[in-house]
Amino acid sequence: MREFCPLIGVIGRSGAGKNVVSRLLAERGCYCIDADARTRELLESYGDSIVERFQVAAAARGLSLRRKDGGLHSAHLGVLLFSEPKLLQQHEEFLLPKVTRLLCEDIARAQAARPKAIVLNAPTLHKTELLQACSFVLYIWAPSILRMWRCKKRERVSFTHLLRRFSAQKGFYAQSIAQNADTYTVANCGRVASLARKVDCILTRRGVLGE
């Protein structure tokens, strides 16, 4: 039985293919944790608090943070936050500690299952202390134009919003490296089979596969 279960971080900018890589890792016996899913849960749980924090700024931009059913309008929240870095920072200071606590609980449960590795699919991993807990990090990369196409295909948002989001994510790789994380860049520009070979090569090199 494996005595040490490595923690693998998966990061990258919007549209790079983090979820595809996570699925590949799951197929290879890894336990995958989706930080975005946890974040969405918290957005619903703390929706009233978030609306209270940002409703004035949202109204000034003609945005409503409430859906018709009364829930938090996460798409409008994203438009607001990515248009103003200070608001994004305030939101992250409020939410990220809560996300991190949930992820720590998820990691503890995953360790009990003794998988080949635990995968933390977390775009903002570099903004939490969990980055230092990772054995290594996969930074998923794709050209901006390809990422733009992927995002437009799956989301009903404007090009302006996507450009602002992309701009806010510029420092992901540099911040990971700055914290001395053992980071591998994985290009995702073609077929899934090619991406899978790259992932397998890294997993084999790190001893996750081939035992």
Curated annotation (Swiss-Prot):
GO terms for biological process: coenzyme A biosynthetic process. It is found in: Cytoplasm. This is Dephospho-CoA kinase. Its main location: cytoplasm. It is an enzyme of class 2 (transferase). Disulfide bonds: none annotated. ATP binds at G15, A16, G17, K18, N19, V20. Keywords: ATP-binding, Coenzyme A biosynthesis, Cytoplasm, Kinase, Nucleotide-binding, Transferase. The keyword Nucleotide-binding applies. Catalyzes the phosphorylation of the 3'-hydroxyl group of dephosphocoenzyme A to form coenzyme A. Signal peptide: none annotated. The keyword GTP-binding does not apply. One of its GO terms (cellular component) is cytoplasm. Residues 7-211 form the DPCK domain. Pfam families: CoaE. Pathway: Cofactor biosynthesis; coenzyme A biosynthesis; CoA from (R)-pantothenate: step 5/5. Its EC number is 2.7.1.24. It catalyses: 3'-dephospho-CoA + ATP = ADP + CoA + H(+). GO terms for molecular function: ATP binding; dephospho-CoA kinase activity. CDD domains: DPCK. Belongs to the CoaE family.
